[in-house]
Amino acid sequence: TGGLDTVAVRLPASAAARKLIEYSGGYVAAPSANRSGRPSPTLARYVQEDMDGRVEMILDGGQVGIGLESTIVDLTVSPPQILRPGYVTEERLEQVLEGVDMDAALLNEDSGQAPKAPGMKYRHYAPKGELVVVEGSSDRVAEYINRAAEADRHAGEKTGVLGSRELLAEYRADVIKCVGSRGDEESIARNLFAVLREFDEEGVTKIYSESFSS
């Protein structure tokens, strides 16, 4: 319930998760397999890192098919309200709902309203290092990232770049990671959190990323 008087219901796409629900003979009430303040685990080994000693068993369903956080929508109000943006975008929701709004607390941090959804009230889904997203044309993005990363290295930072396959060869940093081709949004979504965790594992303190918004 997230502290509210409503209940969120989710039907997972994972075949392993569906089998678990089937074998349970009903419904499963459980929190997500991650601790707040870390990138969401997309592999069983990341769940083990976060939950070691806290759970007795981990069901390994392989790499996740999507990888991004789920979209949370409040259907108790009209029009429906997005409480947490996720893989299912506002545009896709509008195709099946007669209009949809965004939670005012997400649009304006100074609104005085507290976000209703888990993960929107504090640092969440974030790597340990500082993450900077750079927007613009491909050549300008690569030029800016390389210049900024060089300055950061001189300042003692361990730098990382999160980039697309198309631009990967253009970057200069201590650690360079590819999340997929710019034309393959599903691949980018599936790999994003795993790559952020890899930056943590390699001790990267400053991460620069291309913008992958469509």
Report the location of each language-model feature.
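Active-site-adjacent structural elements in enzyme catalytic cores
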Residues: 1-214
